[in-house]
């Protein structure tokens, strides 16, 4: 009887740990998936049609985007104070990649996967907006931008966070 209880408790503990850490065999954050590649293709279509160079997907920039996503997730789930959120965002914007400074940034939270809202038409609208002080505008408008990182994740409240960063 004692062994059965021990096995049952161990199994329950393993199951609980699996649920808490989301170790179910599938990654919670995608790397370069079809969805994130589609977003980059949409950005590059707008850039090249407007005489700018296409952005290159860069692993280091994608890592920075991953860090931005983690901060956004904490904010959306109310796991971080506004003060700490601003501090972490400032720290992230100071990161350099290949000697380059951050140029553009966009984080969206949507009910469905990010590529459904970050279409070529949406990026063209951003390009045409003339909002030069907006970080998302610089993603499609900056001639200095060379690298891009895009990450997407469905968080525990069912929403999707998509982050785009350019350097």
Predicted segments with their positions:
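Bacterial N-terminal signal peptides that target proteins for export
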Residues: 1-10
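Short, contiguous strand/loop micro-motifs
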Residues: 6-7, 29-31
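Alpha-helical transmembrane segments
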Residues: 10-17
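C-terminal motif of bacterial Sec signal peptides marking the signal peptidase cleavage site
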Residues: 18-22
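Bacterial signal peptide processing site
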Residues: 24-27
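Short, well-ordered surface patches within globular domains
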Residues: 31-96, 137, 145-148
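A well-ordered secondary-structure block
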Residues: 87-167
């Amino acid at each position: 009887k004692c062994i059965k209880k021990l096995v049952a408790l161990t199994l329950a503990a393993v199951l609980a740990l699996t649920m808490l850490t989301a170790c179910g065999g599938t990654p919670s954050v995608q790397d370069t998936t079809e969805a994130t590649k589609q977003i980059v293709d949409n950005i590059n279509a707008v850039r090249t049609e407007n005489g700018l160079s296409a952005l290159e997907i860069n692993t280091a920039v994608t890592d920075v985007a991953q860090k931005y996503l983690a901060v956004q997730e904490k904010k959306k789930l109310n796991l971080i104070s506004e003060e700490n959120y601003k501090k972490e965002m400032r720290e992230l914007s100071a990161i350099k990649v290949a000697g380059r400074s951050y140029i553009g940034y966009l984080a969206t939270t949507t009910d469905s996967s990010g590529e459904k809202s970050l279409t070529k038409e949406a990026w063209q609208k951003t390009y045409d907006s003339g909002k030069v002080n907006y970080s998302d505008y610089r993603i499609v408008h900056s001639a200095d931008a060379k690298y891009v990182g895009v990450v997407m994740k469905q968080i525990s409240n069912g929403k999707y966070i998509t982050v785009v960063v350019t350097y």
